[in-house]
Amino acid sequence: MSLELEKNKDQNKLLLSELNQRIAAIKLGGGKARLEKIRKQGKMTARERVSFLIDDPTVAIEIGAMAGYEMYAKEGGCPAGGVIVMMGYVSKKLCVVVANDASVKAGAWFPITAKKNLRAQEIAMENKIPIIYLVDSAG
């Protein structure tokens, strides 16, 4: 292989590694301590609720995981826009599933949360598929 090709390959591997690290951090929502607090209350986290509902989470796709990335730093951040949006099968029917992430500011909405919810609704309407909301928020 050419030197140029090897450089590009290495650069892409580095970028993919960085993306995977960011996604892993985003999947922690408001952090390990908040996730544990939710579990101690006897509740499932937003991601656990979605995984439980969807027939096969391995064939589902998350929409907008990077929403809110590096936004709202003064407020402590807003991973995934404070809401999980997945497309997957529920009882063998393709659906959009939206779940408030209570680990992010107790499920409070940020402007990016509203945009992400609207996008989820647009996707459901444009594709004529059901949308399911799993709500867990302080108000």
Predicted regions and their residues:
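Terminal-region recognition feature
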Residues: 1-139
